[in-house]
UniProtKB/Swiss-Prot annotation:
Topology class, membrane: Multi-pass membrane protein
GO molecular function: transmembrane transporter activity
Keyword field contains Transmembrane helix: yes
Record-annotated membrane-spanning stretches: 17-37, 53-73, 86-106, 107-127, 142-162, 165-185, 201-221, 230-250, 273-293, 299-319, 334-354, 357-377, 403-423, 435-455
Record's note on what induces expression: Down-regulated by MgrA. Up-regulated by NorG.
Gene responsible for this protein: norB
Gene Ontology process terms (BP): response to antibiotic; transmembrane transport
Protein's name in the database: Quinolone resistance protein NorB
Organism domain of life: Bacteria
Entry-linked InterPro entries: MFS, MFS_dom, MFS_trans_sf
Subcellular location: Cell membrane
């Protein structure tokens, strides 16, 4: 077993602030492009398809590599991987802002995805190592403020910065925040697992995972254009299924697998991770709702982002409330309450058939419930996943949990956008938005069922 270095060092506020700042480089800054797509089209003189690739590729690459990065953090050092992630974000941000070349935009966004893959599992592992009991729950609350809170603020933040300062300032500010995070984390003792032998990295598993996820993403985003009977669609589907099947077989046989499926023998961990995937999938709500009010109601990006102010306020307030509910009620009840409230919010935002003034009111209230629900859910879910991971595997476990976050967001956005486009072309944008938002509500309902069935009433059983 790993000897926790927290015996010699205890986490403090300086380290925690550095961790939170590193986390928001992805969840706040990198995700802010979700509300500035038309501006990027003009700035880079390119089409919406290219911009959509740039917007989604960050979360996709984060999800593909986050598990591998979690394993590297366990082996070679969590502080080291965090610092590498922060430096990668600076590099990616520079590539994005130095020119108007679309290729550099995509490469920069790809590098930001790798940055997030390093930062997320490594920082969760640092919290596991250096914070104990209520201090750990407090640290996870602030970590959740950086992730869930950042995702809540990103739509309004991106629209506001792009309108008032110019979109490049999103990444200039991200570079400044990254430098501050590096300074605050500097001097923290390294923490790594001593029980994992430095075996050869699972390259085969990583390659298969990348092939599977890229194929699946293309099927979702381009499926309607390709046609389900086309040779390319069928080929991609076969590649996705084949690579997934081979990945499962190889990972179960590997001595040092990329994903340790033994972690999923714990129902609490499985429930937290699966529900986390689905509730991050409802990020598609922001894409659909923002696009609808801009195209259907004629709103600007700043006006569209302003509708979600209640979301960002509530998610920031309720994350600490979720922490207190975790301490008093255990993990299951807050996760169920949060998910249930979120579903109500989704239903309100989906009422696109209403007159404009009534729909705006429903949006404001719906986003309030949306943020309230996610805020209550965030800390209990994260704590459930981390608390049920063995210390020597916490980096990999955190990596899988955050892979669920990133891939849930990436595929939720892709699937919601695809449904919105298909139904809108068949009917109108009002119906298209409503059906796409119902899809997000459905993911919330499925998440509720998973929590109900898998997460125990008292989270006291650990691997």
């Amino acid at each position: 077993m790993e000897k926790p270095s927290r015996e010699a060092f205890e986490g403090n506020n300086k380290l925690l602030i550095g961790i939170v700042l590193s986390v928001i480089t992805f969840w706040l800054f990198a995700q802010s492009l979700v509300n500035v797509v038309p501006i990027l089209e003009d700035s880079f003189n390119t089409d919406i398809g290219t911009v959509n690739i740039a917007v989604s590729i960050t979360a996709l690459f984060s999800g593909m590599f986050v598990v591998g990065a979690g394993g590297l953090a366990d082996k070679y050092g969590r502080i080291k991987l965090t610092n590498i992630g922060i430096i990668l974000n600076i590099l990616g941000s520079l590539l994005i802002i130095i020119s108007n070349i679309p290729l550099l935009l995509i490469i920069g966004r790809l590098i930001q995805g790798l940055s997030a893959a390093c930062i997320m599992p490594a920082t969760l592992s640092i919290i596991k190592s250096y914070y104990i009991g209520k201090d750990r729950q407090r640290a996870l609350s602030y970590w959740s403020i950086g992730s869930w809170g950042g995702s809540g603020v990103c739509s309004f933040f991106g629209g506001a910065v792009a309108t008032l300062l110019g979109w490049r300032w999103i990444f200039i500010l991200s570079i400044i925040i990254s430098l501050i995070a590096l300074f605050l984390i500097k001097g923290t003792p390294e923490t790594k697992s001593k029980s994992i032998s430095l075996n050869k990295f699972d390259i085969k598993g990583l390659v298969l995972l990348v092939i599977m996820l890229l194929s699946l993403n293309i099927l979702i985003t381009k499926g309607s254009e390709l046609g389900v009977t086309s040779l390319l669609f069928i080929t991609l589907l076969a590649i996705a299924i084949g690579s997934f099947s081979l990945f499962i077989v190889l990972e179960k046989r590997a001595t040092n697998p990329l994903i340790d499926f033994k972690l999923f023998k714990n129902k609490a961990y499985t429930g937290a991770t699966a529900s986390n995937f689905l509730l991050n999938g409802v990020a598609g709500t922001l894409i659909v709702a923002n696009t609808f009010v801009q195209r259907g109601l004629g709103y600007s990006s700043l006006q569209a982002g302003s509708l979600s102010i209640t979301y960002l306020v509530m998610v920031l307030i309720m994350i600490r409330v979720g922490e207190k509910l975790l301490q008093t009620l255990g993990c299951k009840k807050p996760m169920l309450i949060g998910t249930g409230v979120l579903i109500v919010g989704e239903c309100l935002i989906s009422l696109t058939f209403l007159p404009e003034i009534f729909y705006v009111i429903c949006c404001i209230i719906g986003y309030l419930f949306f943020g309230l629900g996610l805020g209550i859910y965030a800390t209990p879910s994260t704590d459930t996943a981390i608390a049920n991971a063995p210390l020597e595997k916490v980096g990999v476990a955190a990596g899988i949990y955050k892979m669920a976050s990133a891939l849930g967001g990436a595929f939720g956005v892709a699937l919601s956008g695809a449904v919105y486009a298909i139904v809108s072309n068949m009917t109108n944008i009002y119906t298209g938005a409503m059906i796409a938002l119902w899809l997000n509500a459905g993911m919330g309902i499925l998440s509720f069922v998973i929590i109900l069935l898998l997460v125990p009433k008292q989270n006291d059983t650990q691997l």
